[in-house]
């Protein structure tokens, strides 16, 4: 973390076991050369995977490039958070502000580490900085934290905790952090029970947001307009 007058740059928010699907890759961040080598290896492996499923991908014009497409999608998009260097996050003094900072409806696209199916939904984040020595961050930086952890393989509970810990680490000397994710899972709609439209809600809270019934937690959920068991924006 570098400091420049009243600004601080944060570039280390990793809080997950290295190498796990929901953690950074062992060699992260990868160079362009390393990514190219990984794509080549993954392309070969996925071709063998299709062979095992008796898919004649080599002669099917719609599937002949599928192994490479899938490999590139994982490295460059779906799991990009495992391989890319995290963008610096700038934090600033709270300067006496002691209210809640809330960002709602942050788009989320992630992947379940169980079946490698898409998780799609929104993230709501709230935090309260200490008015004496707390830090606040630029609004878009919350989005960057979510992209960093979301572009990996994770179950929603793990992802909620990772985002919470990332925000908690960057917003130093905070009085509390709360993260709620509302998302649908393709592993529910496309396999098994095959039910579409079911949404999962997870919340991780610390500090003043920790206990039900307190003012800070109530204000956060009131801002999300929770009614009839669902979150309506």
Residue ranges and their predicted role:
Residues 1-233:
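A domain-level signal for the structural core that forms small-molecule/cofactor-binding pockets
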